[in-house]
């Protein structure tokens, strides 16, 4: 039975441009939606602009326009950028809408009825000139720890200290420059620390959905444990505090019912925007039963799903506040959170001074193909919270090698012969061609990888098939057959078979490269490709259209021009830009310190290095180790055999905090093959797999090393 899924992406804030860092998560979501639709599932894909809050209000004031005018303009800009990159929402709405107001008020009213709303008096800074309470980020002063000037009200960019705004020395308003005064105001709180909420969240964050899939990736679930604690010990170690859901006027947002001058905090109504956009879509369409996807009882009866694609910076809101709000207001909770990491460029934080803080608009306006980036981001996505590094040289190499050199090359080498020699009509397919059989055989592997959002694994398998298809062409040499008398029939079969292989590859690449797939469908004169139930070659006598160039190579000069277009002047920064430049200097300092720490190792000789036997290993089995907090048991194929059978190695790897075992099976990694076996209480570990982590423990990530496309089990790393 087809699945019925509501899919959302995180709502971008209506106070800035879409940049490449944003696009990581949106492209991941769009690929998954396209794959599900190719499988025949019903998917509603919605998003919206997150429009409320002090920053929007102040930016509109600075521009001399209303907040409504600002968010209207930004809405058009955001939708244009998403469309250019093939992110095809069914509806792109706004949180400043009648639907969102209705949902926000309903959720609040039901939480209040459940006795989960409190009011308390709090003391906070107030700007006497602007006559407004100041959020932490709109208060500046000297750090109470290190004395650094021009620091925000919640943390110091120079020393990293966290503190309350009232601890700042010589504070001033970042809005007016005035010295703020302390005033008391009544605020509204969602009682997240209530035992009912804590018990629910412990179960929800650690559990599985109706399909048996984890609601949270293993890394996300482990992070939630830090906040929710262990219910078997005392008070459980719960560190959740009640959540302030109100802000004082002036504020751009929705006023709280029965509380004049008090507004819903932006993070209360922002995720509710998912429901609002969906209801707005239903009103446009007229054939969607909204409550089947949003009401707790009806959603369970209808068997619908709700999947959120978000960045790890907003995990706290989506894994704690959002499901608790929904649960106690009578709405359905998310089926799954798909959390992506941050984007770095060439191994470092995006930087305006280096030109790597790249907006979507500048990328498109410089003439770069958005599908180059879609493909590259997909190759780096593995369904975990790992950060994605955009290595610009690697992107050039991957696109040119994989898409142009392998994939498009199949059609460009064979289509001309069909047009010139056979009037555009295909012949019979070669029944002995193994590439077609391999393509059919790989369907399950690729489908599973797409389902798990392990797009990198899917694309590695697809490129393996592309290698087989190219090998078929190379073995039969159609360019030589065309010169030989009496080889017309053979030439016809070879070129027709190659184009069937090309069709198969296009089908698999379609979720990632929808625009290119559409061109191929037109070239081959076929119906839109859907996930196959059975595999059939393109029929004999089928007429294809003349071949037109499908994709150009990436030139390094295009990348250099893009960086230059995004590089800010290195002249002294204007006062308004001091904050950003200070942050960048601090980030670059941290990066330099980390690099220094990680490279300060004694030299070894080449003879020492050659003693280490590094092999490519395929993970054929992975499972948790009972009684071990950090270990996963891996079974590895490094090309060894015994009595004609593959001999597998067992390795215990301390990567449990970063990986779900199910996502590791089939993946290639690097293993130290000649490490002496080590006897542990769980068994014997017969080697070591390689992973990266921060040398100074400031970053908690663990990143398993994976070789590039083309590597195979047993190959030596030299």
From Swiss-Prot:
Residues 573-599 are annotated as: Disordered. Binds 1 zinc ion per subunit. CDD domains: Anticodon_Ia_Met, MetRS_core, tRNA_bind_EcMetRS_like. The keyword Ubl conjugation does not apply. InterPro entries: aa-tRNA-synth_I_CS (IPR001412), Anticodon_Met (IPR041872), Met-tRNA-synth_bsu_C (IPR004495), Met-tRNA_ligase_1 (IPR023458), Met-tRNA_synth (IPR014758), Methionyl/Leucyl_tRNA_Synth (IPR015413), MetRS_core (IPR033911), MetRS_Zn (IPR029038). GO terms for molecular function: ATP binding; metal ion binding; methionine-tRNA ligase activity; tRNA binding. Zn(2+) binds at residues 143, 146, 156, 159. One of its GO terms (cellular component) is cytosol. Its cofactor is Zn(2+). GO terms for biological process: methionyl-tRNA aminoacylation. Belongs to the class-I aminoacyl-tRNA synthetase family. MetG type 1 subfamily. Is required not only for elongation of protein synthesis but also for the initiation of all mRNA translation through initiator tRNA(fMet) aminoacylation. Homodimer. This is Methionine--tRNA ligase. It comes from Aromatoleum aromaticum (strain DSM 19018 / LMG 30748 / EbN1). The lineage of its organism: Bacteria, Pseudomonadati, Pseudomonadota, Betaproteobacteria, Rhodocyclales.
């Amino acid at each position: 039975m087809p699945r019925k899924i509501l899919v959302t992406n995180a709502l971008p804030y209506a106070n800035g441009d879409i940049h490449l860092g944003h696009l990581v998560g949106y492209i991941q979501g769009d690929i998954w939606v396209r794959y599900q639709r190719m499988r025949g599932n019903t998917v509603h894909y919605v998003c919206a602009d997150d429009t409320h809050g002090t920053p929007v209000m102040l930016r509109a004031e600075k521009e001399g326009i209303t907040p409504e005018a600002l968010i209207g303009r930004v809405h058009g800009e955001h939708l244009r950028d998403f469309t250019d990159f093939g992110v095809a929402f069914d509806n792109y709405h706004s949180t400043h809408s009648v639907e969102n107001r209705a949902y926000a008020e309903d959720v609040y009213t039901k939480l209040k009825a459940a006795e989960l709303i409190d009011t308390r008096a709090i003391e906070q800074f107030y700007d006497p000139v602007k006559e407004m309470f100041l959020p932490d980020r709109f208060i500046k002063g000297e750090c109470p720890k290190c004395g650094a000037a021009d620091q925000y009200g919640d943390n110091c960019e120079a020393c990293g200290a966290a503190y309350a705004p009232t601890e700042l020395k010589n504070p001033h308003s970042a809005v007016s420059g005035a010295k703020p005064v302390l005033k008391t105001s009544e605020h509204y709180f969602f009682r997240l620390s209530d035992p009912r909420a804590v018990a629910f969240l412990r179960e929800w964050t650690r559990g599985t959905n109706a399909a048996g899939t984890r609601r949270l990736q293993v890394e996300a679930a482990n992070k939630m444990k830090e906040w929710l604690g262990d219910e078997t010990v005392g008070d459980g170690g719960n560190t959740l505090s009640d959540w302030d859901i109100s802000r004082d006027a002036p504020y751009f947002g929705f006023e709280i019912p029965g509380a004049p001058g008090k507004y819903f905090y932006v993070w209360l109504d922002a995720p509710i925007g998912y429901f609002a956009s969906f209801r707005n879509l239903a009103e446009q369409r007229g054939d969607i039963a909204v409550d089947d996807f949003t009401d707790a009882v009806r959603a369970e009866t209808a068997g619908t799903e709700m999947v959120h694609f978000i960045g790890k910076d907003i995990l706290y809101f989506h894994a704690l506040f959002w499901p608790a709000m929904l649960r106690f207001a009578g709405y359905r909770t998310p089926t799954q959170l798909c959390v992506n990491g941050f984007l770095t460029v060439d191994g470092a934080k995006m930087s305006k001074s280096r030109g790597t803080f790249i907006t979507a608009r500048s990328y498109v306006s410089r003439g770069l193909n958005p599908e180059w980036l879609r493909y590259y981001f997909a190759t780096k996505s593995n369904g975990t919270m790992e950060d994605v590094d955009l290595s610009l040289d690697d992107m050039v190499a991957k696109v040119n090698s994989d898409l142009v050199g392998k994939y498009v090359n199949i059609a460009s080498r064979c289509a001309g012969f069909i047009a010139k020699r056979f009037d555009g009509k295909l012949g019979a397919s070669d029944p002995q061609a193994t590439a077609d059989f391999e393509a059919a055989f790989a369907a399950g592997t690729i489908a599973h990888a797409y389902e798990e959002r392990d797009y990198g694994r899917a694309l590695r398998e697809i490129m393996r098939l592309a290698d087989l298809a190219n090998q078929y062409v190379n073995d039969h040499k159609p360019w030589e057959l065309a010169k030989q008398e009496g080889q017309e029939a053979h030439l016809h079969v070879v070129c027709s078979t190659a184009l069937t292989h090309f069709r198969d590859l296009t089908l698999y690449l379609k979720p990632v490269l929808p625009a290119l797939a559409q061109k191929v469908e037109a070239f081959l004169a076929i119906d839109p490709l859907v996930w196959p139930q059975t595999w059939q070659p393109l029929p004999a006598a089928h007429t294809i259209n003349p071949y037109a160039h499908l994709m150009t190579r990436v030139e390094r000069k295009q990348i250099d021009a893009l960086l230059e277009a995004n590089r800010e002047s290195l002249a002294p920064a204007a006062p308004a830009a001091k904050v950003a430049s200070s942050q960048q200097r601090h980030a670059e300092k941290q990066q330099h310190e980390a690099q220094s720490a990680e490279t300060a190792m004694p030299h070894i000789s080449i003879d020492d290095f050659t003693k280490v036997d590094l092999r490519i290993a395929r993970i054929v089995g992975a499972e948790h180790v009972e009684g071990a907090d950090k270990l996963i048991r891996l079974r590895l194929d490094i090309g060894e055999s015994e009595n004609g059978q593959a001999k597998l190695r067992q390795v215990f790897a301390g990567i449990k905090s970063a990986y779900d075992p199910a996502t590791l099976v089939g993946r290639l990694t690097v293993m130290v093959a000649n490490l002496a076996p080590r006897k542990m209480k769980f068994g014997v570990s017969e080697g070591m797999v390689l992973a990266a982590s921060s040398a100074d423990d400031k970053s908690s990530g663990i990143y398993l090393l994976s070789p590039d496309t083309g590597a195979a089990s047993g190959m030596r790393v030299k």
